[in-house]
């Protein structure tokens, strides 16, 4: 039946089903195989770590992208025989992809339109893939998110057809050396080979205010990724007079009417900041001319990563970018959660339009883990959700399994808290949250520095077992996968007031990530909205939703 659908209907279905279902369709019949294969190869996300499906929406990210599919290997588990490491498995899967292209290059390579790289892809395999694409990839238009110059070298034969350009850095990580003339010559050659009239996205690791001094008319790009590096701020060979540099702004280089997406990523360490006498970290905003972006009124997506927080800069961005729909704030150092910031955002024009918000901030809560050396310290559950589910988790999991030696919530040895601190273990030590880039509409979730929840459970139980004093012959029960999910849900309930600020202030918000925890904002009824987790969602019930009844129902 599926293979008999008109192509236009088939096409609409294909764009709405995840990769797993697309693969299943290849086995239905020959016509179905031939119809679905272009949708599998059109947009490729080349990952070097395992992909994770969400249980709230298992299609998240893979309706648009196709990923390299492989599982996580728990290399530290002595009970499991592992024939290879995660890194080795990733290379093998990547090489299988290369082999598949090599077997049918004329049929498969022309199907590829977009490739998203990740930084640590095996360089040798990537070189071979690019050789195939340079010869047969006639429809390849977009290749992005890479930092190695070798990728640009492989893409040179396709320069005129590409709509993306990455001006890679002189070295992977910033150094204290000045930029060499040979590096600048390479960048010059890249730019000369590129058709700037076709360019839609530019990623640059060099000071644009100095490098692009003779571009002529502004580039009509849609997306700009600006990397701030201490080693590419000053370009001696491109320096002009001070008077000229003061006049040059980003609006002279990029067309303000076309730029829609702006990502600013700082590579500065604390040691690289200007001294207090020179203006401190605020001086970086001035040196890179970032205030010049306030003249770009059509920005719809703004990402600020690894910068030091500047209230002045952010507030002006929110006030000027009336069309802002996507916002990411991931600052270096201290950035406290501030209700006044969200209130300010809600009063701006963009506050009514914002759909996706990713924020990393300090919530300044200590939960029940005491910050004291007092040998007799009581566990404190004040502020926790009073619902029956949370009460059950506290009594059946926390008190009976994690702190079985406590009496009346009294702790005997605070020095061993870190092994018992399941929140720290869950979100920092053995993270269960995959990296979910909600500001990219269709980006799949990846387990960069996270582990499956089963691995977290094993490691937490091992840490717990090694620290529990069992002098009273107390039965030590290991936590289970279900217990771990209950602890995660307990934490989400604890954040009720934080979620409520966003839910009530930003009426069109669809996705919200707080400190790496991705959620979907759903409309419960005509009056209420709530955040639900994208991962480990099964069994979750929001504690911010109330049953609404009318007078008739109340007294019937």
Swiss-Prot record:
Q: Which GO terms describe its biological process?
A: protein ubiquitination; SCF-dependent proteasomal ubiquitin-dependent protein catabolic process; ubiquitin-dependent protein catabolic process
Task: Give me the Gene Ontology terms describing cellular component.
Answer: SCF ubiquitin ligase complex; vacuole
Q: Does the keyword rRNA-binding apply?
A: no
Leader sequence range is none
This protein's pathway? Protein modification; protein ubiquitination
- Cell compartments where the protein resides: Vacuole
For this UniProt entry, the molecular function terms from Gene Ontology, in alphabetical order, are: ubiquitin protein ligase binding
Presence of keyword Transmembrane: no
Domain F-box positions: 1-44
Keyword annotations for this protein? Answer: Ubl conjugation pathway, Vacuole
Q: List the disulfide bonds.
A: none
**Annotated function:** Substrate recognition component of a SCF (SKP1-CUL1-F-box protein) E3 ubiquitin-protein ligase complex which mediates the ubiquitination and subsequent proteasomal degradation of target proteins. Probably recognizes and binds to phosphorylated target proteins.
State the oligomer form and interacting partners: Interacts with SKP1. Component of the probable SCF(YDR131C) complex containing CDC53, SKP1, RBX1 and YDR131C.
| The protein, known as | F-box protein YDR131C
What high-level taxonomic lineage is stated for the organism? Eukaryota, Fungi, Dikarya, Ascomycota, Saccharomycotina
